[in-house]
Amino acid sequence: MQIFDELKNRGVEDVFFISMDGVSGLEAGAKSIFPDAVVQRCIVHLIRNSIKYIPSKEYKKYTQSIKRVYGAPSLKAAQSAYDTFVNEWNKYPGAIDVWKRNFIYIEQLFNYGSAVRKIMYTTNAIESVNSSFRKVTKKGTFPNENALFKLLYLRIKELNIKWETGHIANWSMVLNQLMVDDCFKNRINKYIEY
């Protein structure tokens, strides 16, 4: 895909993880440019894609049930929770099918420590940025395109301040869990100053 070529051309040297929805060809495009990247399905998108098959009065119970799967402490516990989930919700085959097609991505989460997993399934920075843009642009019409660009630029500056002062919770634990894997350790060491 062109987007990954553009990232490479702009200087991105390595990508460890990519969280994406199931758009056809996207995973192959990512892997062709960043072959060492781990491609992960976005849990939020999987929930959204499956919940459309669930009656609204059952949303909360359904999401709590699936959270027991991806939030499990181990792969064995996740597989057990998944079996329970399938048995509990099999009256909605459309919802179950979404998870069956993508369960391999849930399983691969457990190749990493709990701190890494939490970041992989709870962080969706791009959607957060898009949501922020929608908030500032829904205020009305703009006299011209340049006015819109200025507003978006100012919002980006505000977000940048947050990003510069913010931090990823438990980052030292995440880093240590990644450093246990020699493949990640060698890649991380290229970018860390000691």
Question: Each predicted region: which residue ranges?
Answer:
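RNase H-like nuclease fold core
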Residues: 1-19, 24, 28, 32-36, ...
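Amphipathic, well-packed alpha-helical segments that form the structural scaffold of globular domains
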Residues: 4-5, 100, 104, 130, ...
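Conserved, well-structured core segments
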Residues: 17, 121, 150
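Short, conserved catalytic/metal-binding motifs centered on acidic residues
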Residues: 18-21, 45, 99, 126-130, ...
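A glycine-rich phosphate-binding loop feature that marks nucleotide/adenosyl-phosphate handling sites
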Residues: 21, 100-107, 168-174
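Extended amphipathic alpha-helical interaction segments
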Residues: 31-125
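Basic, amphipathic alpha-helical segments enriched in Lys/Arg and hydrophobic/aromatic residues
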Residues: 131-194
